[in-house]
A protein has these predicted regions:
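Metal-dependent phosphoesterase core characteristic of DEDDh/y 3'-5' exonuclease domains
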Residues: 2, 19, 26-70, 76-161
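Short acidic, Gly/Ser-rich segments with clustered Asp/Glu that frequently serve as metal-coordination loops
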Residues: 8-16, 22-23
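Short, hydrophobic/glycine-enriched beta-strand segments
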Residues: 3-7
């Protein structure tokens, strides 16, 4: 089974949120990074603008642009939802027949990933496990704290403690 770690950025914590970007890293180091051009920017508050949108390639992030240009392991896509879906499925097809996704706080990220790939979990390709391994629950168990406390803890703090 191949593990693929991923994170998404989206327009807010609400029911009709739209995907802004997605990054994935396989357990062997292959990477995929995409920014979507057709997200609903009317859903973005000041926090999303400052902490997400302002750091995108689409916003002129030259530091990220340079980093990605020098990185031969990253597949980079900028496009609409259909473009990103096509390229992501092509990338995932290269991993064989059994993929397990891993994320921090899966209940946000996995829904958006499933919608991107297949318009929902029930339509995922057979080689993709529809269940996501949640790192937040691991943090909760390792530190013997509630999942709420694990959700609130800084990931940088967790890595250094």
């Amino acid at each position: 089974m191949r593990k693929i770690f991923f994170d998404t950025e989206f327009t807010g914590l609400h029911q009709n949120t739209t995907l802004v970007s997605i990054g994935l890293v396989s357990d062997e180091g292959e990477r995929f990074y995409a920014e979507l051009t057709d997200y609903d920017d009317t859903q973005c508050d000041d926090w999303i603008t400052k902490n997400v949108l302002d750091h995108l390639l689409l916003s002129g992030n030259t530091e990220l642009e340079k980093e990605l240009e020098e990185d031969e392991l990253t597949t980079r896509v900028i496009g609409n939802r259909d473009d990103v879906r096509t390229e992501l499925l092509n990338w995932l097809d290269g991993f064989g027949d059994d993929i397990q996704f891993v994320s921090d706080v899966c209940h946000y990220d996995m829904v958006l990933l499933c919608e991107l790939i297949a318009d929902g979990a029930m339509l995922l390709p057979d080689y993709i496990n529809p269940f996501c391994h949640d790192l937040c629950q691991d943090i909760s168990m390792i530190l013997d704290i509630s999942e709420k406390a694990a959700f609130d803890i800084s990931r940088e703090q967790f890595l250094t403690d």
